[in-house]
Amino acid sequence: MPTADFHQGEYVGEHFKARKFITGFSGSYGTAVIAKDDAGLWTDGRYFTQALTEMEGSGVRLMKMFVDDTPSTTEWLAQKIPEGGKVAFDGRVLSMGEGQEYEEVLGAKNITIEYEVDLIDQIWEDRPSLSKKPCFFLEDKYTGENVASKLKRVREKMAEYGATVHLIASLDDNAWLLNFRGDDIDFFPLVLDYVIVRKDSVDLYIDDSKLNDRIREEMAKNNVNIHPYNDIYEDAKKIGADEVALIDPMKMNYALYKSLPCKVVEGANPTILMKAIKNAVEIENIKNAELKDSIALTKFIYWVKKNYDKMEITELSASDKLTALRAEQEGYIRDSFEPLQAFGEHAAMMHYAPSKETDVVLKEGGMLLSDTGGGYYEGSTDITRTTVPVSYTHLTLPTIA
């Protein structure tokens, strides 16, 4: 059970937090493996302390990645599972590359892999449903390039690979390609979907209740056919044997890869480099987003310094205040990630986010570490600053005559 959804995203919606459900660990990165007589949680140094605290008494052991001789999940399974045994996982939440590694390593011990089973779903009685939040279209004044132009460029790259179809499962690539955004994952303007680009058409797999008339209009104009979200797996099996599919092994889930009956060409999604090179409109928009965020943060620092000794300001209330100041800026959508407001000793903890249980009051003599960001129509920001609550307005320094 990795930290992933069907699209290999590290940050996922509530429906996909199976690892948290089974282990109690809520960090953004980690993989749980459950055996008959043992269980382990693999994560990196950012989360060792958090994992030990949250998993206390759970029976799940912390496996410290990149420390000493800690085995990888694959190595651990190969050691743990006897010859001729069986390993089961939901192939939709494992990457194609991970699945192939399991095939190679476990296959050497004649271990069977069952990748079309979601055991957590069978025991998670109140599992949250998939998000149904609406999408919105991002106009040319924000993107600087329309859908038709982007599809043309992708098809040119497909031709270089000799591909007749291109399957895209990564949400950021699909959002960039079709110029719409969603709200299926907290703090990220993404929507759960798959895309198949063909020579003359596009198939979009999505919950169409999320689409507004503007998006439907743009999709129709670009010959984008809309299908139910989960139909992708059966439709992938229907791709002709004479077709050539371009897929990105780092961005494609294992189950979808196994559904393909045609020849496969592996390569990075062309959209990755395309969206990395910003056009003039995007560059100007990024500057505007950063200016808006700077205004909000400057107001926040001033507010902390002026009010920490006049009212009770805590880590959580500081987070709320900064979010409110960002919301005053035109074009604000949401925070770009969970606000990390850490005061005093909390500032020494990597990726500390305050909660009702850990929240503390800001006092003179300590330091507030603010690691936050804002999401705007023009772009997203990520900024870290330290603020020291003090009651004086100037410093007197000793001088040497």
Regions picked out by a protein language model, each given a short descriptive name:
Residues 80, 105, 157, 161, ...:
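Generic, well-ordered alpha-helical scaffold segments in large soluble proteins
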Residues 123-163, 169, 277, 287, ...:
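Flexible inter-domain linker/hinge segments
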Residues 393-399:
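Conserved small/polar residues in nucleotide/adenosyl-binding loops
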Residues 15, 102-106, 380-392:
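Short, compositionally biased
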Residues 1-82, 86, 94, 98-237, ...:
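N-terminal accessory/capping or targeting/presequence segment of soluble
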Residues 114-115, 121-123, 264-285:
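Terminal amphipathic helices with adjacent charged low-complexity linkers/tails
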Residues 10, 376-383:
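Short, Lys/Arg- and Gly-enriched loop/turn segments at beta-strand edges
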